[in-house]
Amino acid sequence: MTITPQHLIALLPLLIVGLTVVVVMLSIAWRRNHFLNATLSVIGLNAALVSLWFVGQAGAMDVTPLMRVDGFAMLYTGLVLLASLATCTFAYPWLEGYNDNQEEFYLLVLIASLGGILLANANHLATLFLGIELISLPLFGLIGYAFRQKRSLEASIKYTILSAAASSFLLFGMALVYAQSGNLSFEALGKSLGDGMLHEPLLLAGFGLMIVGPGFKLSLVPFHLWTPDVYQGAPAPVSTFLATASKIAIFGVVMRLFLYAPVGDSEAVRVVLGIIAFASIIFGNLMALSQTNIKRLLGYSSISHLGYLLVALIALQSGEMSMEAVGVYLAGYLFSSLGAFGVVSLMSSPFRGPDADSLYSYRGLFWHRPVLAAVMTVMMLSLAGIPMTLGFIGKFYVLAVGVQASLWWLVAAVVVGSAIGLYYYLRVAVSLYLHAPQQPGRDAPTNWQYSAGGIVVLISALLVLVLGVWPQPLISLVQLATPLM
């Protein structure tokens, strides 16, 4: 296949981030300079984000048999790049107090974001596997970056071992699918399934095993056991990336697979996914009730949020509204998570041992950091799905597609799960306004709102509120990505 200039334009985000990886690597080899390498990383990610405009002008196309660039890919590439940018921004002040090598952090984030972009453009099971591995391998190092802390190292080892096992299941499942269908391309798989192969035992077994890989990365029950420990043990900026970019990219590629290859047409697959969604929603919310560590709480709540998204995925065959629901929900989840983890990062900067992740550390925050407390309140309300926030719009969409597809038991699970979630999110919000403890703990810098991380947190809060009241710009953007499939 001949690569034309149009193909190169379509691959601009991937090429720019790849070039940035090389430049940062050479910069580290030449001279260690934290500010220089952080700046190069942010410039590269911003350039990749701007290049999406040129990609849009080029139109949808199959760049290679492995990759398709279209509106869908652009939307998810943009979300991954935004999450990566926020991670680098939150990491800079955190790393200022870090005594070991600082620069490699940005290199690992860039490589992981490269994997996320690859997943957003994936059109083949080989690309899916490569993308998942490319996003996972740097996370092994990022999670254990504060390696002098026992819980960070423990979290990294847990994630590494379990991730390797999940990847093995994914690869074995792909082998079974290939053995039955003779194809790994999403479109070719769609044709094979359309020819009546969907009920072949080998194919069903293959897809069943393949669920384990993405299910692990998305923290879905019963593949969720790593989530609370890793969220708690990982540095706050890494938890930001883990909760946003990683999950958005992987959910995006799973949805594209379901669009091309109508796996959801199989009643057996739908029942299995329905049980996973139901269990994730209920279990995630119930376990979050008793948490006193904010990062663990957000870890358990992420299990339930991915359960909500799975409802929209199951309803995908019922209409295009499911794609719209997933896009809007993921955007709301991205900005809400960036804000919540951003506050934790600001409270934990610079690196001074364990993060400020205990709920007690935030007690009475309003009385000395009122704006930061207001931002955290907005994020908790959005994650809870309270009206006038972007989280409510996303949750409303999920309920609407659930009703449209007559998934009544899952709709009931979403309603019950949201009611349970309201309690623990409000518990965090209320603690911000209680009387401050006699001995103050960790605190954000006095001028936090003027730092790059503070600006990202404030913009996230503003977007959550503005798009919660006036969601039409976001809905229009997501709708633009839908017809190009």
Swiss-Prot record:
Pfam families: Proton_antipo_M. Keywords: Cell inner membrane, Cell membrane, Membrane, NAD, Quinone, Translocase, Transmembrane, Transmembrane helix, Transport, Ubiquinone. The keyword Transmembrane helix applies. One of its GO terms (biological process) is ATP synthesis coupled electron transport. Its EC number is 7.1.1.-. One of its GO terms (molecular function) is NADH dehydrogenase (ubiquinone) activity. It catalyses: a quinone + NADH + 5 H(+)(in) = a quinol + NAD(+) + 4 H(+)(out). The keyword Cell inner membrane applies. One of its GO terms (cellular component) is plasma membrane. It is a multi-pass membrane protein. InterPro entries: NADH-Q_OxRdtase_suN/2, ND/Mrp_TM. The chain crosses the membrane at residues 8-28, 35-55, 71-91, 105-125, 127-147, 159-179, 203-223, 235-255, 271-291, 297-317, 326-346, 373-393, 408-430, 455-475. Its main location: membrane. It is found in: Cell inner membrane. HAMAP family: NDH1_NuoN_1. NDH-1 shuttles electrons from NADH, via FMN and iron-sulfur (Fe-S) centers, to quinones in the respiratory chain. The immediate electron acceptor for the enzyme in this species is believed to be ubiquinone. Couples the redox reaction to proton translocation (for every two electrons transferred, four hydrogen ions are translocated across the cytoplasmic membrane), and thus conserves the redox energy in a proton gradient. Belongs to the complex I subunit 2 family. NDH-1 is composed of 13 different subunits. Subunits NuoA, H, J, K, L, M, N constitute the membrane sector of the complex. This is NADH-quinone oxidoreductase subunit N. It comes from Salmonella paratyphi A (strain ATCC 9150 / SARB42). The gene is nuoN.
